[in-house]
From Swiss-Prot:
Function: Component of the translocation and assembly module (TAM), which facilitates the insertion and assembly of specific beta-barrel proteins into the outer membrane. Promotes the secretion across the outer membrane of autotransporters such as p1121.
Subcellular location(s) per record: Cell inner membrane
Membrane topology, from the record: Single-pass membrane protein
Source organism of the structure: Citrobacter rodentium (strain ICC168)
GO cellular component: plasma membrane; TAM protein secretion complex
Family: Belongs to the TamB family.
Name of the protein described by the UniProt record: Translocation and assembly module subunit TamB
Amino acid sequence: MSLWKKISLGVLIFILLLLATVGFLVGTTTGLHLVFSAANRWVPGLEIGQVTGGWRDLSLKNIRYDQPGVAVNAGEVHLAVGLECLWKSSLCVNDLSLKDINVVIDSKKMPPGEQVEEEEESGPLNLSTPYPVTLSRVALENINVKIDDTTVSVMDFTSGLNWQEKNLTLKPTALQGLLIALPKVAEVAQEEVVEPKIQNPQPDEKPLGETLQDLFSKPVLPEMTDVHLPLNLNIEEFKGEQLRLTGDTDLTVFSLLLKVSSIDGNMKLDALDIDSSQGAVNATGTAQLANNWPVDITLNSTLNVEPLKGEKIKLKVGGALREQLEVGVNLSGPLDVNLRAQARLAEAGLPLNLEVVSEQISWPFTGDRQFQADNTRLKLTGKMTDYTLSMRTAVKGQDVPPATITLDAKGNEQQINLDKLTVAALEGKTELKALVDWRQAISWRGELTLDGINTAKEVPDWPSKLNGLIKTRGSLYGGSWQMEVPELKLTGNVKQNKVNVNGSLKGNSYMQWTIPGLHLVLGPNSADVKGELGVKDLNLDATIDAPGLDNALPGLGGTAKGLVKVRGTVDAPQLLADITARGLRWQELSIAQVRVDGDIKSTDQIAGKLDVRVERISQPDVNINLVTLHAKGSEKQHELQLRIQGEPVSGQLDLAGSFDREEMRWKGTLSNTRFRTPVGPWSQTRAIALDYRGQEQKISIGPHCWTNPNAELCVPQTIDAGAEGRAVVNLNRFDLAMLKPFMPETTQASGVFSGKADVAWDTTKEGLPQGNVTLSGRSVKVTQTVNDAPLPLAFDTLNVSADLHDNRAELGWQIRLSNNGQLDGQVQVTDPQGRRNLGGNVSIRNLNLAMVNPIFARGEKAAGLLNANLRLGGDVQSPQMFGQLQLNGVDIDGNFMPFDMQPSQLAMNFNGTRSTLTGVVRTQQGEINLSGDADWSQIENWRARIAAKGSRVRITVPPMVRLDVSPDVVFEATPSLFTLDGRVDVPWARIVVHELPESAVGVSSDEVMLNNQLQPEEPQTAAIPINSNLIVHVGNNVRMDAFGLRARLTGDLKVAQDKQGLGLNGQINIPEGRFHAYGQDLLVRKGELLFSGPPDQPILNIEAIRNPEATEDDVIAGVRVTGSADEPKAEIFSDPAMSQQEALSYLLRGQGLDSNQSDSAAMTSMLIGLGVAQSGQVVGKIGETFGVSNLALDTQGVGDSSQVVVSGYVLPGLQVKYGVGIFDSLATLTLRYRLMPKLYLEAVSGVDQALDLLYQFEF
């Protein structure tokens, strides 16, 4: 064999072995595991915990990769490849999932990378695959990536795709729980204050007019060619839930839906639905990236941000980008505006038609309107090189008089000419004509005219009539400006005072001002300003002569006269002032006299003197007799004295110091300082040393103390305050008696507090100040008067502390109540400026409810122990709580309780963002079981539920109501709605109403409630609406005794409440009953109360008949009441039917009109019955005076057997009844004694004698 053949054979064998090795390593499970094992060993920083399966089901677990600046931890990676697809020349991946991935990248620790040279563009990019690629499932679960200060977290993501040639289809995709936390923008350091410098014009600066001319000389939209996308993309459905972006702004997207496709440059948006914390967006549309680039987009949005909450936006974009683009915007809600625009972006000059229309615009958008513009029309037509602008509107507001505004203007890219801007208001008009030009410098020329302005109707307390003319011109170029007012005229009168303003002035940015003369006259008062302020020389005089300021302006009064002169140069100015004012008044403030006398010069040093004297300052709650300020000296040595005499504050201080201009340093002392205040006198114990260093922007305050008879506040060491510093303040003593002037009469406090504050800061570094504050109380006692009874609360220990260190804020407290329990706790907030994570605990031990017993009446009490052990977690946006709160042995006995409560329990268990409630309320008869839960995982959409279920719980409201109730109700609460559903059964009840209180009167329909300022109060409505759907079932053993009616009630009522108010639906029946009135004994034969709406407007259907046993001739006579409770209709009926007179006779007398009984006897019986019925309340009052309870006067019997009966209780269990016949004068004496609650012994003495034993039954 030749050498060539041997070499060829060797090469062939090597290639075959290499291919076989690669095939073994890649194509077999064993080989694949060997590859990962080698990578685990040889790749620096890579660690793979477990490898299972092959290509069809490959799983990698516990993967770690560490490199400088990069740390990757992967819990599980799964890959499933469909190898059978390879035979069909396609690539199929059945599953690619990543779980529990954590990536941390710190770019500062990464080595610098090599700079990559940018590749030159090689023409349009086309992406295409020669073989179909199918990715059936892609899944991400619990992915966390942190790059420097940016964090991205994904809770769950599933998707899939198909890629064939240029067509890429994204299968239905779901994304849940995305969080992108961006770093907040660092606060810009405070800039140092520097002297203003005048910026001179730059000759090479391009004028604005030339810039705009170049911009509009060619189309705004550049020449556009057809765009060919490298792929045809089809997103079938992309759904997202709970997507959140945090940082400087916090945005939460509750749901997202996207359907979009792009084929050969034809874009189609089938759906874009976004529901976020800031609003909702729905959009559809089409666009073509070729030819004229036609577009058709429709967008609807609802905003959820203040002040435009609830604003609806409709946007329509049509036309073509390269021809005419049409835009329509409709805003409705707090702001109602319609906008229509047509623009040709591809033409030079930018042809544009714009129209804005609004029927009404108000500010603020919600709440009370302070400003309103009606019928606003704005129109712009033409090109930017030649356009016409017009605007019309009518405005009004709280501080704005009604006015009509019109504007007509023309302009181009170099100037705008305001032909007329007219404001018609106050019975006159104001016109502005102006020309603004920016071809070279920005210059203007304008003329403002006031014609016939009259404020008499708008401000009747300050009527004025004004006319005037103001002309102005000026220019601005390169940061330098100049302005001139060649004519200023204003004439008229203000409240019978002549007004005259006349003058002219001019100035520039070099602070050169020339005032030839400025004269102001208001009635007898005048002021004049004349002079120059040049670059160096100063020569300005200002005089004021105001002998009659009374009523010159509303609330102004007094006299003033003075002179101010400015002389010298800018480097060495001199100020001379001599001003005197007497009897000054402004609104409720009055000053008897003000005198200012000063002479200040500035050469190499500022020196001079200034004296200010103010006498008798008075306004509500303030009465200052004298204030004097005296300052004199120079920079090197100066002093200031301030004296105040009056109420509520008086005192004095002395300040002396020196200033070194070279070092920009001032040093001084504050001494002889004391003040008298409503909380007592304050004074210094030593002079305060002050040192201000201007170059360092720092001030030092020496140690000192402030003392008060009830307090002492000390600074034990020097405070250096500047960009950084530290301050320590000790509160050695603070007696709560100081707070008495500020506390209501119903609150009293005593005790002493002491504390300390130590705070350090450094504004040159990011973060919050560092420090701590402690406060400790001794013998602290607070007494609050409740219901005219004192409620004392004494503390054995009362400590509060606050700490801020290492980017963590903490608040702690320790409270020990005298002869009671204790409350301890601490709350921590980590990273207060960032994530604001919560931590801490709250503990309550053996807190006894008996501490409120002092406010209860005699015989009333409260008992029970409150214990809690709670732990805080989560963050401020999503707080969490863990632990339990228990209330055991709760027993509240009081007249205000509707039931006799027995020891009961209540417990709440907290588990993160959820809690549960269990409890039982025990009574002497029956118990109520409580259960419930709450959820605040979404703090803005919290939810709470409480259910109550009981059986025959006795409710007593003495002395009128006793009933048994069996509730089965559920109360649910959300931020937007309260609901109450369920059923309440009343199987047994006794309702007794003897009489209404004398003071009980109905509320007038025109009642008006006034507040403390005697202004009508607005009716208060519930912040959260209440909906109820409650059924009340009245059982067969419910009886009522009220106003002579004794009856049994049955029926069902449905209690419903919504935004319209409370309503009742249902029927109450009276199957049996008796009604005693006007001496007659009526039986309820039929009784129905129909409810359908407001509870006080039932429909009545009641029939009451006279007792047939007391009616002759077997006649049934009665009264029928029908109609509504507001307008009932009563009629008399009889059976058999007869005339109204005959029926009335049977109803009142029990006999017909043709009866043989004497009419006088019958009439006597009837009148006595009517009179006795009306005298019940008077007789009852007489009985109470003589110690007889329930004394009553009534009639009994019919016809000749009629009697007048007096009855009453002379002892709690002994009733005496005495009756005398009306016609036979026979007397009957009855004694009834109660042996047991329902067992009576009765003795009757009259014509006959009897002794009876009676027992009362209830059915």
